[in-house]
Structures are given as C-alpha cells and as structure tokens.
Amino acid sequence: MNNQKTFKGLRLAALGLVAVAAFTAGCSDVSTELKTPVYKTKLTAEEIRNSAFKPEFPKQYASYERNDETTVMTEYKGSVPFNKNDNVNPLPEGYRHAQPYLKNLWLGYPFMYEYREARGHTYAIQDFLHIDRINRYAEKGGLPATCWNCKTPKMMEWVKESGDGFWAKDVNEFRDKIDMKDHTIGCATCHDPQTMELRITSVPLTDYLVSQGKDPKKLPRNEMRALVCGQCHVEYYFNGPTMGVNKKPVFPWAEGFDPADMYRYYDKHGDLQVKGFEGKFADWTHPASKTPMIKAQHPEYETWINGTHGAAGVTCADCHMSYTRSDDKKKISSHWWTSPMKDPEMRACRQCHSDKTPDYLKSRVLFTQKRTFDLLLAAQEVSVKAHEAVRLANEYQGAKAAGYDDLMIQAREMVRKGQFFWDYVSAENSVGFHNPAKALDTLAQSQQFSQKAIDLAMEATQYGIGKDLSGDIKTIVPPILKMNRKLQQDPEFMKTHKWFQYLPVLPKADQVWDGQKRLVSAKQ
C-alpha cells in the first residue's frame, strides 16, 4: 500500500515537473526552431511584380493591400504623411508631436527640403518620386541611383544589368522605368517567388553577412524573420569614390550596432581632407557651423537587436506581422506592416503578454515613448545651440584663446557627435520602444556632447559669445518651419532666417518632373 502511494506520489510529482517545464517554456525566449512552410508556386524565379503573387496567396495579398491606409495615427506615429518638423499646423500638414528643429539641423542637406512621416510600403515609390529631396527642377536628380535600394525589388534587375556601375548613376535615370504600384516594396523583396522561403535581396546586407562568415541562404528562419526587415530598416551610408565602389551602400556594423560603435566606424571610413577630420566620413557640411555631419537613417534593426525583445528572440514579424484569421478562419501572417498600437486589442503583444490588458500594455508603450520624445526635443535644442555657438565662434572678432583653432576643431567634433546620437533615436521609428534603455542613454549622451561643444566654443572665444547665447534657444535660433527647393529660389525668402545667409539662392527654374511625368524639357 505504502509502495503504491509512493509510486503514485512520484508519478504526480513527475507530471507536475513536466507541467511546470511546459509552462516555463511557454514564457521563455521565443524558440528559433520554427518549421519552414513549403510551397511550390507557378511563378518564375525572376518574378518581382506584386500583382503576380495575388492569385497564389489571395489572403496574404488582401492584408498587404491594407498598407494603402493613410489616415490612422497612434499617439506619436502613424501613416498620415505630415511634415515631421511642423508642430504648428494640424494634421495632415503638421502634428503636435513634430520636432521643430529638423530643418535647422539638416541645413544644407536634402533632408531640409522635405521630411514627412512615412506612409505604408505600398507608397514607397510614389512618395519617393514626389519628394523634394530629389531635384525635380532639373533633368538629373542630384542623388545617386543608390537611393532606389530600399524602394523596389527591381533593384535586382538593375544591379544585374549594370553591376557596380549602377550605384553612381543618377537617380532620375530610372524614374520612368518602373511601375509605382507593382514594383514597390512587396512579396519579392522578402520571398523566393517559387518556394516563398524568406530570402535576402539586399546587396549591403548580403555583404555584411558574408563579412561575418555567414551564408545568407542558410540562416535560421527566426533570424530571417528579422533580417528581411533589416534589409532596409537600418543605418547605412554611400561609399565615397576613394573608399571602394563609388556610391555603393554599406552598413556601418563592423564594430557593433550601437551609436558609439558606428561613430567609431565613421571616423575611419571616409575621405575628408578637412583639418581635424582627415579620413573621416561625412554626409555633408553644415553651413552654419561648418561642421562635417553624419545623417542617421532609420536604425530600427540596430536598436531592436540588443533590446529586451531582440535579446529574447522576438522578431519584427512577431509584432508587426502577427497572426490573424481570414474569413474562412484560416490562420495567416498579416502582411499589413503596421504598429501593434493600431489594434485596440493589442493582440500582437498579448501573444506573449496574455496576462495583461490592452490598456495596460498601451500605457507601458506610451510611458516609454513620452519619455523618449521629451528627451528628443531637449536634445535637439541643445544641438541647435551647439551649432549656433560654433557659428558665433567662427565669426568672433574679439580676443580669442591661445588654442582657438584646436578648441574649435574639438567643438565641431562634439557638434557632429551630439547630433548623430540624437539622430540615431530621432530617425528610429519606435520613439524609443524597440530599446528604451538604449534610446534614453543615447539621448542623454547627445546632450552631453552638444553641451561640450558649447563649452568649447565659449572657451575658444574667452566667453565673448556668452551674451549672444543667453536666453531661450527658440528666440536665439527660431525653428525653420518652411524650406523647399522652390523657396530657395526666392531671394526675399532667403532673408527670413539668419542661418539662410549660408545657403546659396538657387537659380529660378521650372519643375521638370512630377512623379513619372515630364513637365518640361530641361537644359543641363
């Protein structure tokens, strides 16, 4: 009898341990042992048209078409294409959570002309061809064909045809050689058309993976569920003519994914000849402070990878392509690439956080985003003040410190670093949520670097510029609300802000391009 009880007790204990283990496994890191679905489509290996995938996968395609939505905002983000520097006007022109100093900080760089909240991926080519960053007032756009890299799977054809010579071609050369809807970011960007296996089509990502000893065709599926997004949602730069293939895109990840890692990388991978910045990389020189600058691009992948979710194996697809049920109750991955915050039930989050209510989960996201956004505004103001301090010090006519030139080099270095650290978070599209600790730490460092620039400029002028930096920065350097290529052709407009004196007045010109339509002939 006692033996039977003992055996029964041991059996119950064993079952209990199994249950606990199963429960724990359900709450632990996401398994990377995902079974890969196997398909055999009727498509060719070269198929890139989005419409060709619709008959094969109508349910997924229907969800993909939801990327056409352009009216819904979350608290800080959304798909309404407002001007991201305009916190004065209401939607759709501006928005209360805009950053007013963007045009100041990007003065002299095409981003100063237009920078809007992105619409869905289905509009990638349409919005690209209408944006003012590309010169539409001349036959040539003034930017390399590299800019097409993350807009279309047609890149594969173009690179195959032209090889590495493709990258340095003018962006407008391909303006009318593409279907804005059928060739936009879509199925072929991430899937093999014949098997639907996830694949890497990005040249710079392939180059990086190979440099790390990885075969892009033999990666675990869970890793691929993030990397297909990491083809484009990343920081990148274009090679200079002396640094390899001219204008070829490169991911600056050789030293790591954090802003400090990238900043070290950029210090060694450029061809600048400016005193104090020799051999460093710069996207442009800010005309007000004369500082060689780096423009950060949307580093979502780098932000996510060592955050809470990235470290746990939770991928982009888990949150932004969560499972849904079609009308016939079939379970599919949604191809509406959007914020989980647009779902009142927060179902993407509750796949793991099933013990939390939707309201609680939203409140936690907003808690992080508010703290991040408040620091973004603070960091950009200190960055603007740093540019102004260096500008004033450049032109200071009073008695200067003995080490003036060296102090000014150091000041510009801190301007450059402070703005890059701010931009790393500003350009990243989660308002801090992909990695709250990294976002807040990066913005704190940004303010420290920018303040150091101010201190160095003050020291260089023996504090002679102090009186001109005293007071509210919005009064000292007003935010630039409007600036575009047409306005830069107007001499009177160019007198409306003191920083505009460092920009040339553009010659009068008619608009040549409206999307893919040529309006007038242009002389080169």
Curated annotation (Swiss-Prot):
Catalytic EC class: oxidoreductase
The reaction(s) this protein catalyses: 6 Fe(III)-[cytochrome c] + NH4(+) + 2 H2O = 6 Fe(II)-[cytochrome c] + nitrite + 8 H(+)
Region of interest (Interaction with NrfH), residue spans: 29-39, 221-222, 318-331, 351-355
Pfam family, one: Cytochrom_C552
A GO MF label: metal ion binding
Database matches in PROSITE patterns: MULTIHEME_CYTC (PS51008)
Disruption phenotype: Sensitive to nitrite, but not to nitrate. Loss of anaerobical respiration of nitrite, but the mutant is still able to utilize nitrite as a nitrogen source for growth.
TM stretches of this protein: none
Binding, heme 2: 187, 190-191, 335
Needed cofactors: Ca(2+); heme
An example Gene Ontology biological process: anaerobic electron transport chain
GO CC annotation: outer membrane-bounded periplasmic space; plasma membrane
Keywords from the UniProt entry: Calcium, Cell inner membrane, Cell membrane, Heme, Iron, Membrane, Metal-binding, Oxidoreductase, Signal, Stress response
Subcellular compartments: Cell inner membrane
Induction (UniProt): Expression is induced in response to nitrite stress. Not induced by nitrate.
Residues binding heme 3, per UniProt: 121, 229, 232-233
Positions contributing to heme 1 binding: 147, 150-151
Cofactor binding, per record: Binds 5 heme groups per subunit. The catalytic lysine-coordinated high spin heme 1 redox potential value indicates that a driving force for a downhill electron transfer is ensured in the NrfH2A4 complex.
Signal peptide: 1-24
Binding site for Ca(2+) 1: 78, 117-118
Sites where the protein binds Ca(2+) 2: 235-236, 295, 297
Quaternary organization: Component of the NrfHA cytochrome c nitrite reductase complex composed of 4 NrfA catalytic subunits and 2 NrfH quinone-binding subunits. NrfA homodimer interacts with NrfH.
Recorded family membership: Belongs to the cytochrome c-552 family.
Function statement: Catalytic subunit of the cytochrome c nitrite reductase holocomplex NrfHA. Has both nitrite and sulfite reductase activities. Catalyzes the reduction of nitrite to ammonia, consuming six electrons acquired by the electron donor subunit NrfH from the menaquinone pool, in an anaerobic respiratory process of nitrite. The other biological function of the NrfHA holocomplex is to detoxify nitrite. This function is essential for the survival of this organism as it enables it to overcome inhibition by nitrite, which is produced by other organisms living in the same environment.
Record-given protein name: Cytochrome c nitrite reductase subunit NrfA
Encoding gene (name): nrfA
